[in-house]
């Protein structure tokens, strides 16, 4: 039974038992900033378990893509060296949110393993939490599990919690017995660390809530969270002991071996690379790009580890990107996003490998030199840090190499150097706090801005300097909270609205609108009278500004769709700022857009504007929205009910912002800038509507002025400038020829001033009225005509000197270098051993310094 068939059998089994199949969530968690990567099936349901979210279903099943590399859950250093450690794995899981509990969960697990997959019951071992008598009775009395294959374990192994407080509960685990020929004892025994008994399924029963004092309270609706590693299960079904022997891994391993010559299929490096192509490809699919921090740095570490192992196997570089197609062969049916992103993944992997290969050989040589000279078993932290800082070696890559040779690293010294570097970096950065910061508010505002730009409302909260007050007087800055408001609070990249709050004998100018908890907070200044609590006011949004923002926001959606069409489906929005005068859009991409791409994008967006499609908004549940093809933004957290914005069949995105009624309202779209802001992140700045027209007119005005200056017409500008550049190039050639002739004459004139000292031809000469370029030409002429020469030429003007020195290559090492001669004469300068240049104030003892140079030559 193939891995793909096992995955599908699991999902089919639970569909037949009323479970909703939920697609694997991104490897980048959207609901947990403390988590580097999704590392378990329950991550996407965390808010459900915490009671912060509800869904339309109470039973779910998933095949979740997981990564454990970096952070608390880091398997990287063991990958390839053990039978079951991976950076990437699939976790099969079934979940109950207040529906079924222990009995059904246990029955489902046992039935699937023994009746669907036909695993002999006598090869399975079960553990429960020692105080969970209910689960024990279900296993022993109802499932008829033999007491000889059953054990009770303590809290460390069989009690799960989400944190120090919150939902928690006992768990029961199912192990597979690989047989007495494999070392190791049963779970809970002193020999349990062996490989004979391998955990394949963990069933967590969340039935308690732990308070701050550590007391457990029964939850009103207990839940079930289960997880089973597909790779481990496949090893059991396929009768192999190591996960790397299952069908999907073997396909990859053979594909890697084919890239080299005479490679042993059991080589550890093949396992490392096979694992790493999985994690790297799926991380890139989910929007992670190699960088020097956070998730991007973990990806970079994994790629570089794979490249190093490829180097160890003698694979011709670049090789890693060639494994994307074999990965698609085994996983593309289950995860079509791999197929859609194939070219993007290959491009990123090839680019990253090429970049690292340039320093890999140098770093390896440096490391091997230090290993040869080691007097003990420890590599210094300084060497490890140099490999990291100069050659791009992640510390775990260095540790890998060191471990293979039975050595270790002085990690304390390495960590101290890393800390020093972090402190220096932090000292160079200054941050300011947001003046809008306020304490958490209990107030709640109802937003009506989708359908209204003005309305009557009542003041339910007033703030000054972050504190609640009862009134705000004329001239004072503060913030106002209304029970109902048409003002849009900054969110999703769209800036907050501005406008006026007008009451009887008072008014408040709104300069910004933000969301704090459930309250919409209007920041600004009282420009008339006094504002007090419970005052009735008229809220009026600046509709001209709002309309301009609408156009820009709708245009960002068209831009996003156009980028995917022109640049590639790998493009993901990474941020935006939608203001009235202009907007910016950040997106994932690995290189600058070329002029042709920018022009194509503008043409596509403006074509959609001319189509004048209606901008349609629908409210639906998140799963229906995703199934309809709506684009969900990278890393964004969504509630169960979402707004889906559609423009014909060209763009469909989840969005809570305000938008134009039709695409034609935008009028005109222009890209005014495109540049990189971080590794793998590009930014487009754009204008629309009347601001786009103003920008175009500004550019036309500039062209007209330039044409007038050059005495031509705007249509002939390109031809005129090309001719000017050609004329300039010809003049530069003529100047270069004249300089060369002048240098030849100058060189010929001073050849007679050469002194021969011990076989070395020395020339030190002050030149009058000669510029630097001519002086360099003269030096080249002299060096080409004089053998074994030390030549120093200098000019003096307004007490400043310019010096150039040259040393024939056949005497380098016998005489002072050219750079040393320049510094000796004028104190400043640098260059190569055979040619250097410098300058500065004329030294008072210039003649003495010239004499000292002669003495240096005489002493050779």
From Swiss-Prot:
Co-factor note (free text): Binds 1 zinc ion per subunit.
Instruction: List the GO molecular function terms.
Output: alanine-tRNA ligase activity; aminoacyl-tRNA deacylase activity; ATP binding; tRNA binding; zinc ion binding
Q: Which SUPFAM superfamilies match?
A: Class II aaRS and biotin synthetases, Putative anticodon-binding domain of alanyl-tRNA synthetase (AlaRS), ThrRS/AlaRS common domain, Translation proteins
Q: Name one GO biological process term.
A: alanyl-tRNA aminoacylation
| GO CC annotations on file | cytosol
EC number in record: 6.1.1.7
Q: Does the keyword field hold Magnesium?
A: no
| The reaction(s) this protein catalyses | tRNA(Ala) + L-alanine + ATP = L-alanyl-tRNA(Ala) + AMP + diphosphate
Q: Which domain of life is it from?
A: Bacteria
* UniProt cross-references to Pfam families, sorted A to Z: DHHA1 (PF02272), tRNA-synt_2c (PF01411), tRNA_SAD (PF07973)
Q: Where in the cell is it found?
A: Cytoplasm
Database matches in InterPro entries? aa-tRNA-synth_II/BPL/LPL, Ala-tRNA-lgiase_IIc, Ala-tRNA-ligase_IIc_anticod-bd, Ala-tRNA-synth_IIc_core, Ala-tRNA-synth_IIc_N, Ala-tRNA_ligase, Ala_tRNA_ligase_euk/bac, DHHA1_dom
Q: What UniProt keywords apply to this chain's record, in alphabetical order? A: Aminoacyl-tRNA synthetase, ATP-binding, Cytoplasm, Ligase, Metal-binding, Nucleotide-binding, Protein biosynthesis, RNA-binding, tRNA-binding, Zinc
**Predominant location:** cytoplasm
Q: Which cofactor does it need?
A: Zn(2+)
Residues binding Zn(2+): 553, 557, 655, 659
Q: What does this protein do?
A: Catalyzes the attachment of alanine to tRNA(Ala) in a two-step reaction: alanine is first activated by ATP to form Ala-AMP and then transferred to the acceptor end of tRNA(Ala). Also edits incorrectly charged Ser-tRNA(Ala) and Gly-tRNA(Ala) via its editing domain.
Domain notes for this protein: Consists of three domains; the N-terminal catalytic domain, the editing domain and the C-terminal C-Ala domain. The editing domain removes incorrectly charged amino acids, while the C-Ala domain, along with tRNA(Ala), serves as a bridge to cooperatively bring together the editing and aminoacylation centers thus stimulating deacylation of misacylated tRNAs.
Similarity annotation: Belongs to the class-II aminoacyl-tRNA synthetase family.
- What PANTHER family does the record point to? ALANINE--TRNA LIGASE, CYTOPLASMIC (PTHR11777:SF9), ALANYL-TRNA SYNTHETASE (PTHR11777)
Q: What is this protein called?
A: Alanine--tRNA ligase
Q: Which gene encodes it?
A: alaS
